[in-house]
């Protein structure tokens, strides 16, 4: 049985929290505990995403953007963290740490362009490198390849 904590720890191996920018709020932001059999991934956790996760019987959502970013001053039914707890769905959010991670967001984007001599900048949150000349049809074919992965 896979637990919330195990999924969270696995995500930290991929994108250690130490890579996050000081202003960011990544991590296990809503912990309902228990077993995880199904996970939904999303860029942002919105009320619609929570509804979809509940409909698909997911116990966890892994998102890029933090579901809690600013300090909470109140919590009510209109708030996504409240909706997650009510549905029993945990939330792991990996933002700038996933941007900066080896094999993370920016390395995947660099890979789409087949970037050469790639190096990190902005404390790891970006990548810069050389690309070869490419035509629009070649780019479309390459994008179709990545979309199929």
Positions of predicted regions on the chain:
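Hydrophobic structural segments
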Residues: 1-149
